[in-house]
């Protein structure tokens, strides 16, 4: 007979984790406040996603966002939640959202030293069919002494202080990194808290899954076509890779992190500069994947090395297990040499 309690009495919640990280860094507490505010927004979005059908939050709000996507009602709600929560942390000066054409400058009385770039609801085209969706964010320090402006957000991903994503799937999960590896937290509905479920996650060196939208195959460049062919018909006679594609980037990236393999959204004839946005889609997930031991590239350089020129700039994105991404880059180099 055991006296072990069915309840954990010393659990590591995400709130506690963030406070401990802040204490170790001997910081001012601003980043701790900011992360806790972001987590509150994520909990609220998670609740809204679960209630969306009953609360009539499905469907289109009747507008198009700055990057050309139809805006769903949940998008609008999620965007407002993140903006209001992080500004009320008194730790931000500039916000960049997928849903807003211009950068949002925090009012002077609420201003702090951090810049937050976020996609409040990634994969929102999947809302109405109940597929997994998510929230993505990256946090930077303001580097100039000037008045806050859009320019403060135009930093390369190497400057990220913390980044993460929330996945609203069969459970709500947060993947977070503050530069010392990646930790995973699951929302416990009974507690209303995120609880640590996996510490210092590492991606496999090589996986068995490739993930991309093959509906665009007619637009692929030669390198992508060759790489996909190699995965389907391996030259060494080994088993082909499995194909998995949700169409919600957070879901596809998280599966790649957990199972290994490769996720591709390369440039193509239709989108020669890529489709995904650098600041609030590519940089945060590239940071997470690199912190987990993987690679993230545009096909020509590491994603985190790209110096942004505009807040809604698009880039190609290929990420995943290091050996898989390296094999893709070999195809790129081979085709460049032959052209």
From Swiss-Prot:
Mg(2+) 2 binds at residues 98, 119, 121. It comes from the Eukaryota. One of its GO terms (biological process) is fructose 6-phosphate metabolic process. A motif (Nuclear localization signal) lies at residues 204-208. Binds 3 Mg(2+) ions per subunit. Substrate binds at residues 122, 213-216, 245-249, 265, 275. Mg(2+) 3 binds at residues 119, 122, 281. The modification Phosphotyrosine is found at residues 216, 219. One of its GO terms (cellular component) is nucleus. Its EC number is 3.1.3.11. Homotetramer. Interacts with ALDOA; the interaction blocks inhibition by physiological concentrations of AMP and reduces inhibition by Ca(2+). Interacts with alpha-actinin and F-actin. NCBIfam families: PRK09293.1-1. Catalyzes the hydrolysis of fructose 1,6-bisphosphate to fructose 6-phosphate in the presence of divalent cations and probably participates in glycogen synthesis from carbohydrate precursors, such as lactate. Specific for the alpha-anomer of the substrate. This is Fructose-1,6-bisphosphatase isozyme 2. The lineage of its organism: Eukaryota, Metazoa, Chordata, Craniata, Vertebrata.
